Amino acid sequence: EAKELGIYFIVLSGGEPTVYPDLFEIFRRHPDVGFMMYTNGTLIDDEMADKMLEAGNISPAISLEGFRESTDARRGEGTYDKIMAAMDRLHNRGIIFGISVTVTRQNADELFATDNFIDHMIDKGAIYGWSFHYIPIGKDTELEMMITPEQRAQLAYRVPEIRRKKPFFLADFWNDGTFTGGCIAGGRRYFHINAKGDVEPCAFVHFAVDNIKEKSLKEVLQNPLFRSYQKRQPFSKNMLAPCPIIDQPDALRSIVLESGARPTHPGAETVLMGDIARFLDILSYNWQKASAPINKQRNKKTRKHQEKFEKVY
């Protein structure tokens, strides 16, 4: 169904995709589709690396939190060394792979304040990276892990600088709204299907109207939740504040209310009401103030590039 709609790039997350027994059979059945999977990397041994090479249409994005101490503290002792060994196996076989990092108040400097971490990933053979800001969803959320507006402002300058200067593509899903025209979720360019089959606007927006086991993909993408989402996009003229969870929380409240969407797990509604919601309201207000001058500067640069383009063509 996805291919019938023109979708030829599919991302797998978890849990851990590499424990799924029929994983490589899916890759073999769809050689015309490009797959990327978020993985902890610990199961990528020589046999699995050979299977990836044979398939030719899968790129792993390996999750880590920084260097050894930070990664092992969150993911278990010895994980970092297993990841480094997995990267060597992938690199030696010429398999395209990248990394995935969750940026928190505690590890933001370790990841991006200097070139050390990115340079190490380049040396290991990674060519791309996804930067996810910590979002307070799921069980036992810790608001003190969320990056501050000041840290986020630093990332708004630092991530594009890395792209310009390094042979490494780094994307920041929250600060790169300038380049994507705002939020890409809600079926505009992307949507998420969870393990139960609930079709959500985004991997972080845990609300749904339909389940993929009950309706076709085409039907689901035209449901009230996706229509309500898309008619509001972009959620702000400030493209550095594109997210309806942490940047425009009133938008998500309106979408859920209007569409009648249900939470896809207990506790998902905490981003809409209660202490977490109040925290996000304050955080979004502070980020609007901090990001406004950066957004203005980016818009000015964009206009200059457009003028140059028009003169050439």
Task: Please describe what each predicted stretch is.
Residues 28-31, 53, 91, 122, ...:
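Alpha-helix boundary recognition
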Residues 95, 123-127, 161-169, 267:
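Structural alpha-beta junctions
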Residues 2-13, 20-132:
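Radical SAM/AdoMet-radical enzyme domain recognition
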Residues 77-80, 146-149, 153, 210-215:
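Short, conserved loop/turn and helix-capping segments at secondary-structure boundaries
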Residues 15, 40-41, 188, 204:
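Structured loop/turn residues at secondary-structure junctions
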Residues 108, 132-201, 242-251:
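A C-terminal junction/extension of Radical SAM enzymes
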Residues 204-313:
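Flexible mid-to-C-terminal extensions adjoining Fe-S/redox cofactors in radical SAM and related proteins
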Residues 71-74, 147, 183, 209-212, ...:
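Short clusters of hydrophobic/aromatic residues that line enzyme substrate/ligand-binding pockets
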